[in-house]
């Protein structure tokens, strides 16, 4: 499933190609036909990402909400005459660009009231600007008030939006914090540092499209196997303490960490 940096990149791409233009919308597959008519021919005001969800706001007060889930994929092209085969749930196009969406978990048209309900439920998104520090404070409050392990909290989209398995493992390794530590056992400084580091790493992800987390690799193009400290490195030596990287299940998801230096 794409993590938040990828969805932010999709939103940025949508704004670049479609914002301010009249957008035609249809459903080649047919499953989105009735909802497509509600926004077909409207002007796209803005594409906005919050965590793993994207919101396409149109000038008639309606918004198309999209969650890719595990199987969803976007395809952007400038070749409007070369339509690729496949089960396209919804197609967005203007005079110059086309975007095909396949296999999303959620694709629906909702009004502004429904958008607000969803936004209020979602946790703060580290890829969005936070000049007053309000999103950081929301994160601190949600973590510090919970007895759940921090490894579970970071995957809870109501605590923080956009983090998946890779960033969860890498952020906690960089912070030298055990994924089993209860949220309320962490100091405010520790929680704040988690937020700051997450913002830093996901900013790199938005810019490059890669989830690179090793400090010495952040400014380089790096092959996939060398981008991370612990993710999918189970059984190998820890790059910090020479311990052995472990893998276990936490709330049905694979967890990678080093017991030797995360406490």
PLM-predicted stretches and their roles:
Residues 64-162, 167-174:
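Phosphate/anion-contacting hairpin/loop surfaces
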Residues 22-36, 53, 142-263:
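Basic, nucleic-acid-binding surfaces and adjacent catalytic neighborhoods in DNA/RNA-processing proteins
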Residues 2, 39-42, 129-134, 145, ...:
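Short coil/turn linker and secondary-structure boundary residues
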Residues 3-6, 10, 118, 135, ...:
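Alpha-helical structural motif
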Residues 4, 30, 41, 51, ...:
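Glycine-centered flexibility motif
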Residues 1-110:
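Gly/Gly-Pro- and Ser/Thr-rich, intrinsically disordered tail segments characteristic of DNA damage-repair
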């Amino acid at each position: 499933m794409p993590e938040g940096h990828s969805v932010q990149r999709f939103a940025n791409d949508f704004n670049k190609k479609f914002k301010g233009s009249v957008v035609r919308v249809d459903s080649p597959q047919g499953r989105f036909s009735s909802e497509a008519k509600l926004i077909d021919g409207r002007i796209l005001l803005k594409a906005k990402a919050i965590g793993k969800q994207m919101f396409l706001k149109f000038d008639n007060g309606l918004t198309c909400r999209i969650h890719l889930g595990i199987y969803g994929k976007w395809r952007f092209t400038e070749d409007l005459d070369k339509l690729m085969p496949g089960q396209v749930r919804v197609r967005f196009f203007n005079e110059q660009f086309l975007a095909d969406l396949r296999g999303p978990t959620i694709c629906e048209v909702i009004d502004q009231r429904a958008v607000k309900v969803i936004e209020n439920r979602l946790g703060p998104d580290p890829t969005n600007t936070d000049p007053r520090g309000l999103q950081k404070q929301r994160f601190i409050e949600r973590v510090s008030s919970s007895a759940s392990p921090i490894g579970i909290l970071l995957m809870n989209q109501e605590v923080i939006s956009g983090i998946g398995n890779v960033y969860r493992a890498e952020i906690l390794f960089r912070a030298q914090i055990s994924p089993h530590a209860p949220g309320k056992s962490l100091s405010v400084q520790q929680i704040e540092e988690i937020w700051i580091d997450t913002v830093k790493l996901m900013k790199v992800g938005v810019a490059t499209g890669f989830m690179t987390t090793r400090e010495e690799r952040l400014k380089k193009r790096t092959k996939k196997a060398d981008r991370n400290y612990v993710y999918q490195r189970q059984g190998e030596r820890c790059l910090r303490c020479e311990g052995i990287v472990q893998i276990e299940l936490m709330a049905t998801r694979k967890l990678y960490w080093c017991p030797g230096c995360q406490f």
